[in-house]
Amino acid sequence: MLYGFTWDTGNGELAFAISILPMLLMGLITTLQAAFLGFFVACVLGMVFAVLRGMRTRWVAWPAAVLIEFIRDTPLIAQLFFLYYVLPEYGIIFPAFLTGALALGIQYSAYISEVYRGGIQAVDHGQREAAKSLDLPPARTFTHVILPQAIPRVIPALGNYLVSIMKDVPVLSVVTIVEMLNAAKIIGDQTFNYLVPLSMVGGIYLILTIVASALVRIVDVNLPKRGVPLR
């Protein structure tokens, strides 16, 4: 028994699998929460990086490029340890779950920023010229002309990164977060049966990946690709 759960270890593998399912589902909820929060942070921070990286002012664009490269070239676990162990030394303390989600978001923001930048650069330059001829300010041109056409182009890539974030959530177990894989390990440690819980986690991840990929394809097919009319 652990965390209020009891496991049936004496009536066969099926009974054991059914008895551990509630704890794995609790781990699944934690996994999804961390993944979606991390994805949200990555999308927002990635857009900030993309805008800064695309500026013509070198003293803004170059530091942004260096920071993006630094984030991409350092391991997720190193960034996680920095947030969890180093920041508290300076009085900056976050709960373990939030720390994990932030680490995921920061790591993937560097990749997503390049996805955004590619989508923005793919928009026909004539769209910018047309907005300029209408005397639209740069900020409104970006939010009303460029982004509505750039975002639909990058939906498939964003979906792929969401799936990748889900599969990276188990790294957060090093800061005591009991996500799905860590829950399976705990069950295995207590029952000496690792095959069943780990196999179940693998199956759940497979289902998650298939469902997420299908949803991304549906959104990509049904999302308008030509943006929205100017107002």
Curated annotation (Swiss-Prot):
Q: Which domain of life is it from?
A: Bacteria
Q: Which residues form a coiled coil?
A: none
First-listed, main subcellular location of the protein, grouped into a coarse class = membrane
Q: What are the subcellular locations of this protein?
A: Cell inner membrane
Could you tell me what this protein does?
A: Probably part of the binding-protein-dependent transport system y4tEFGH for an amino acid. Probably responsible for the translocation of the substrate across the membrane.
The record's similarity note reads: Belongs to the binding-protein-dependent transport system permease family. HisMQ subfamily.
Its recorded name reads Probable amino-acid ABC transporter permease protein y4tG
